[in-house]
Amino acid sequence: MTDEPIMSRLPIEDVLPALRRILTEGRNALLTAAPGAGKTTRVPLALLDEPWLDGKTLLMLEPRRLAARAAAHRMASTLGESVGGTVGYRMRLDTKVGPKTRIEVVTEGILARLLQQDPALSTYAIVLFDEFHERSLQADTGLALCLESQRLFRPDLRLLVMSATLDCGPVSDLLGQAPVIACDGRLFPVETRYLDQPLSGHLDVAVVQAIRRSLAQDQGSLLVFLPGMAEIRRVERKLLDLNLGSNILIAPLHGDLPQEAQDRAIAPTQPGTRKIVLATSIAETSLTIDGIRVVIDAGLLRVPRFDPRSGLTRLETIRVTQDSAEQRRGRAGRLEPGVCSRLWTSAEHQSLAPRRPPEMFDADLAPLLLELALWGTANPAELSWLTPPPAGAVAQARELLTGLGALNAEGQITAHGRQMAELPLHPRLAHMLLTSVPLQLTSLACELAALLSERDILRGPSGWRNADLRLRLDVLHGEHDYAGGATVDRSACQRVRRTADLWQQQLPKQANKRQADKQEDLQSVGLLLALAYPDRIAQRQQGNDARYLMANGRGALFANPDPLGSEDYLVIADLDGGTQWARIDLAAPVWLRDLETLYADKIQVVDEVLWDDTAQMVRATSQRRLGSLILSEQGLSKPDPSQIATALLQGIRRAGLDRLAWTPELRQWRARVAFLRRIEGQESRWPDRKSTRLNSSHERLSRMPSSA
């Protein structure tokens, strides 16, 4: 079910003696092993009896929950035990370890929690970073903190970085010139097929055609890589419409599925049954799905990318890299000779990037910066990084955390920031939960945070949109199976409730769990969201029901008609960054009076004197602003004369000098001056009547002091 089939000998066995020798010497190490070599589950078991463990535990990081659970189950099964004995795992909302556990498999975010609780990792002898080539933000951060722990507290702590594809030189240098151990060789050969011509037309149609061809000419079950859930659902519907037969099972596999559905997708099938697994990149590494002999790769990947200039994250669909394509190809050769059908040409393959850039370049760094501040590091440059955090993203993250009260002006963590860091949430949501305590809205805040952290509980048909978070809360409070044109995902609702209850338990004891009136709660949704997303408070633009201006100066819109489109003010919790206008995905209305109370200290009064192109006149107003939003304005009774002159000049520049009320006599004078200047040439003593020169003259006049 995980990294390799049960066999008497795997390729990794050949390098285990060298690995044991290096670790016995007390050194860090780097292990590269081809897919299927057996590193994920054989290496931890092979180190169990090493004397340098001295009663301590092995800690292994996996990039995904599914991979962590599967690896733990596989190792426990090899020992003839259940998970929670010698082998256990830890992840958010799910932990199975016991007093006899000696191997802990954890998701990458757990390592930072363990380090914050015990910077020396005193109960662990070694940390293994599996699939490090993925270069996730949490893995990079975990390695930097482990190196700091090793330097300050635990020189005997071993670090082992494991990967299938990795540029070894920089990693070896970071680990103190750590030896590199290479394990070559795949278990079984894989035939690779390319398209003759570049793919044209709809992706889902091409994928279904490739599946039908493979069912007809190849043996075994199929693993199909698709960029996201939307494509998985479309392909699944098309396959179901084909009535492929009772011996063909179709199994989606992605990170938002319940654990039971994920387990079904990777479980063995009955004899005579073939399975078609429709997966995202979740199946790319650390998993062996029993029976898979064919891989069909669409060659695409959907990734979140954070723009520090806008503070927004957008989802982008990108081409896979060569190392990622090789990982996917390897899924077909785990159990027997296999086939990999790539939906691109061999020429296109040569143009693919060798590997993806580290997540550090594309991530929101606010959680990282808060984690480092809790560690005691105000400046990320103080740590040893394989890839240092980009300065622009660090500056944006520091600005956000300072605004939320998590950091002081020197970048050091505050008491409020320490409380935020204790909650396993994005700093925005942690701030919302803590601030909800004095407002007596903790139950609602926990539900909101859970809704925003888990998958959407509503599933609509293609093109369906309803961004209102209040609708989801109403569904969560009731037992509806259908809401607003969408079906209700009951398993997602259960997970949201469980997550909300967990966070309620982690809040300070004075948190009020009153059973508030549900209608009153729904009216407070926008207020709570404004605590988490002050930069995304949005004001509807006049004359347009779909477009909003956010407090950060960015624009946002509803891609399709939405019930929220008539609200004067929204707080946008989730949006796709886009280019000029971001698409609103989740939001709630907020009352202006709540904003004026909540951010009274942030509202500025600005006097503005500007030229109005529409009215062709100077407008002088006093405005109350929240960021880029004009909450109210009124006319100025006594505007500054110099500002009026400047505004008039702006109007003249835009409309041109001909817009002025020239008399016939003045027009004749301009013509005579122009004639004389043309006769005398460049050295003429007569002024240039061109608009640019006259504008300049007017500007000089506007700077002259007015008479008393």
Residue ranges and their predicted role:
Residues 690, 694-708:
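Single conserved hydrophobic/aromatic residue that forms the stacking wall/gate
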Residues 41, 246-247, 252, 296, ...:
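Second RecA-like catalytic domain
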Residues 1-432, 513-516, 576:
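P-loop NTPase motor module signature
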Residues 258, 270, 688-690, 705:
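Residues that cap or delimit alpha-helices
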Residues 186, 195, 561-565, 708:
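A short, sequence-level motif marking secondary-structure junctions
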